[in-house]
């Protein structure tokens, strides 16, 4: 029966993988729902307050770029040639060979530069033209040939074009997507969890599928009780910090994190899924690798280390077991549990795996940085070639002996090694950090310039264009059976109790890596959801034309911010009522859909604006004169934050104005402000229209 269950688990997992690759959106069992377009009013202010509504910020985001591109290509004729030119340059930069670049560079020059020059309508500088012409005359076609044009295209787009985008419906759609992104609260219900694929000291790793996009990931679940039992809280939190540091920017050579979340019992990391097994496994199955095969793995690992070191992260656990293969045979560095940030303080702890640890790591009290990883790389490459670490002779398992040899032994390299390989390994395995390759001031560049890698084009390595020496078999789960992986003995943690203080440690654990979420959405459901939302909004717009649209009421007025909230203000009502709210400098108005805005609170009536919690949900509490209370609930975290800020600012400014105005004697004050009255104070409009 156990065998049958294992087979069924494998089949289910493999089917999910295949369907995810073909049509991930079709595998989505949940649907992302975009908020109403009126969310723009609140979200624009929220993003502006954080410096996010700039050309650079929006253009550099995947979804921001796609919406800006759509606007320019389909709604702004003057910007269309600029964006088309930009896209052609980006395609050129990804070409694999010089021959392809020679042909394409000439086509781009003729279509987008010479044609415009002849028509006297070339909107770019003479320097940019001369830069490209000079290279083409010499038949030099580097990937960054058109970089001066990229800079000038962006300069031309960031002015009036960007301002028109901000005023368009495409920016409204950007606000809708950003609201979804900034309100992500993941739970186990957001994933379909498949078979176990690995186990570590604190928990297990599973294959899983994200419900709203259909994308496959690895879910690393750490048991909070086991963490507490082993006093591993610092290690668990450190791994989340290290993953967050290395998971931004384009690096296909590290197992990166897209999300982190926790439940009452578990910490969960959502990571890149690697289906091809690890190098330790393949070394045992395949036998030692040739120099050429090892060069392939070394090159990709070097780029992974370079990415980490550029972010001041030292990995500290480089070994074949931590190098995972994807289904095509390319590799990524995994498991950042021992990684460390050395940007502010260099570490001096002796951590890692014996036989791969650098001498400075083994020496007590000696501080080190990325130097440790280059020594470990030398040890690992030696193992790929010879089947054992250079300091683990005769398969000794004595850790003290291995450490002693690491600190004292001069490594003898076999005569069969090529001179270039000997030079590389001798440089990496230098005990003296000041003489070690990679530690002489230029980091990874020194290693990449080794004669051993002379035949490589590093751009081709980065683009993963070299054929892997080993391709994992398709249609197989390259992991041990669930039975062989085993499970934890729950008796171990039976007496461990998780206290409130334990849970407090993980209060800031949840995280979404913005660029990875946006990439996931763009690859899967972005177009589908945009099309569906467009249809829904068109129908609603037609209906609202008859009723009077909520946003129309704010037009031409001094409305600070407006949008939907739910209120609970009547002592006889226990249910939330969804209403559309308008904040003015001297009052807060609201109405139901299609109703006239008759209800309002003046700033004079409000005594304070506070945050409260009702059934574990954050709400806004407005304390009203006469001991009354008015509770507001927002649909998302950004809305709550922004409404609280705007209400407090309006209340404070109204109070200050009242204090500046001499009190009127013998004249009663009305608590209700007529809608026709002149506003108390003018603040910037954010009608979002």
Swiss-Prot record:
EC main group: transferase
Designated name of the protein: Beta-adrenergic receptor kinase 1
UniProt domain comment: The PH domain binds anionic phospholipids and helps recruiting ADRBK1 from the cytoplasm to plasma membrane close to activated receptors. It mediates binding to G protein beta and gamma subunits, competing with G-alpha subunits and other G-betagamma effectors.
Annotated GO MF terms: ATP binding; beta-adrenergic receptor kinase activity; Edg-2 lysophosphatidic acid receptor binding; G protein-coupled receptor kinase activity; protein kinase activity; protein serine/threonine kinase activity
Domain Protein kinase: 191-453
Swiss-Prot/TrEMBL keywords: ATP-binding, Cell membrane, Cell projection, Cytoplasm, Kinase, Membrane, Nucleotide-binding, Phosphoprotein, Serine/threonine-protein kinase, Synapse, Transferase
The protein's assembly and partners: Interacts with the heterodimer formed by GNB1 and GNG2. Interacts with GIT1. Interacts with, and phosphorylates chemokine-stimulated CCR5. Interacts with ARRB1. Interacts with LPAR1 and LPAR2. Interacts with RALA in response to LPAR1 activation. ADRBK1 and RALA mutually inhibit each other's binding to LPAR1. Interacts with ADRB2.
Organism placement in taxonomy: Eukaryota, Metazoa, Chordata, Craniata, Vertebrata
Function: Specifically phosphorylates the agonist-occupied form of the beta-adrenergic and closely related receptors, probably inducing a desensitization of them. Key regulator of LPAR1 signaling. Competes with RALA for binding to LPAR1 thus affecting the signaling properties of the receptor. Desensitizes LPAR1 and LPAR2 in a phosphorylation-independent manner. Positively regulates ciliary smoothened (SMO)-dependent Hedgehog (Hh) signaling pathway by facilitating the trafficking of SMO into the cilium and the stimulation of SMO activity.
Catalytic activity: [beta-adrenergic receptor] + ATP = [beta-adrenergic receptor]-phosphate + ADP + H(+)
Enzyme Commission identifier(s): 2.7.11.15
Phosphoserine modifications at: 670
Site keyed Required for receptor phosphorylation: positions: 3-4, 10
Family recorded in the similarity comment: Belongs to the protein kinase superfamily. AGC Ser/Thr protein kinase family. GPRK subfamily.
């Amino acid at each position: 029966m156990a065998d049958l269950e294992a087979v069924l688990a494998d089949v289910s997992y493999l089917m999910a993988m295949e369907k995810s690759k073909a049509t991930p959106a079709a595998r989505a069992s949940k649907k992302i729902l975009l908020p109403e377009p009126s969310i723009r009013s609140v979200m624009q202010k929220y993003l502006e307050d954080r410096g996010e509504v700039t050309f650079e910020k929006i253009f550099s985001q995947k979804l921001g770029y796609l919406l800006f591109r759509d606007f320019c290509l389909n709604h702004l004729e003057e910007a269309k040639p600029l964006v088309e030119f930009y896209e052609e340059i980006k395609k050129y930069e990804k070409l694999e060979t010089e021959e392809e670049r020679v042909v394409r560079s000439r086509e781009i020059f003729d279509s987008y530069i010479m044609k415009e020059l002849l028509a006297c309508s070339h909107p770019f500088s003479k320097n940019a033209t001369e830069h490209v012409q000079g290279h083409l005359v010499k038949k030099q076609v580097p990937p960054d040939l058109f970089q001066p044009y990229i800079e000038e295209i962006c300069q031309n787009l960031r002015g009036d074009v960007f301002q028109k985008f901000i005023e368009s419906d495409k920016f409204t759609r950007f606000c809708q997507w950003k609201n979804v992104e900034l309100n992500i609260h993941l739970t186990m219900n957001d994933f379909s969890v498949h078979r176990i694929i690995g186990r570590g000291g604190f928990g297990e790793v599973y294959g899983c599928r994200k419900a709203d996009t259909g994308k496959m990931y690895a879910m690393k679940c750490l048991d909070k009780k086991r963490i507490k039992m082993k006093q591993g809280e610092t290690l668990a939190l450190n791994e989340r910090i290290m993953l967050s540091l290395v998971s931004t920017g384009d690096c296909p050579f590290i197992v990166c994190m897209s999300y982190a979340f926790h439940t009452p019992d578990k910490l969960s990391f959502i990571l890149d899924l690697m289906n091809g097994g690890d190098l330790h496994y393949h070394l045992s199955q395949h036998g030692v690798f040739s120099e050429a095969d090892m060069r392939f793995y070394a090159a990709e690992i070097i780029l992974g280390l370079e990415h980490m070191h550029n972010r001041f992260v030292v990995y500290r656990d480089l070994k074949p077991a931590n190098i995972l293969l994807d289904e095509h045979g390319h590799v990524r560095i995994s498991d950042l549990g021992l990684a460390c940030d050395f940007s502010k303080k260099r570490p001096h702890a002796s951590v890692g795996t014996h036989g791969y640890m650098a001498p400075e790591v083994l020496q007590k009290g000696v501080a080190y940085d990325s130097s440790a990883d280059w020594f470990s790389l030398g040890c690992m490459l030696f193992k790929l070639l010879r089947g054992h670490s250079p300091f683990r002779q005769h398969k000794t398992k004595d850790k003290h002996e291995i450490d002693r040899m690491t600190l004292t032994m001069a490594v003898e390299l076999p005569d069969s090694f090529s001179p270039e390989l000997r030079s590389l390994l001798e440089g990496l395995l230098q005990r003296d950090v000041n003489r070690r390759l990679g530690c002489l001031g230029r980091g990874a560049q020194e290693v990449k310039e080794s004669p051993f890698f002379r035949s490589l084009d590093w751009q081709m390595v980065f683009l993963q264009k070299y054929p892997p020496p080993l391709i994992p078999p398709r249609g197989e789960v390259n992991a041990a059976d669930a039975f062989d992986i085993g499970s934890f003995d729950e008796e171990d943690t039976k007496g461990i109790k998780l206290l409130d203080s334990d849970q407090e440690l993980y209060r800031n654990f949840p995280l979404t890596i913005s660029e990875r979420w946006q990439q996931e959405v763009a690859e899967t459901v972005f177009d589908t959801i945009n099309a569906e939302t467009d249809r829904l909004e068109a129908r609603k717009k037609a209906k609202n034309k008859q009723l009077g649209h909520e946003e129309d009421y704010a037009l031409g007025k001094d409305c600070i911010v407006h949008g939907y909230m739910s209120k609970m203000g009547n002592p006889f009502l226990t249910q939330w009522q969804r209403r559309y709210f308008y904040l003015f400098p001297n009052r807060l108005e609201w109405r139901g859909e299609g109703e006239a805005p008759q209800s309002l609170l003046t700033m004079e009536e409000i005594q304070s604006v506070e945050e409260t919690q009702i059934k574990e949900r954050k709400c806004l509490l407005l304390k009203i004169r006469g001991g009354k209370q008015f509770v507001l609930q927002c649909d998302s975290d950004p809305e709550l934050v922004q409404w609280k800020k705007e209400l407090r600012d309006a209340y404070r400014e109204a109070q200050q104005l009242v204090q500046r105005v001499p009190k009127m004697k013998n004249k009663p004050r009305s608590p209700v402000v007529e809608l026709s009255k002149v506003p108390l104070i003018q603040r910037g409009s954010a009608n979002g229209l």
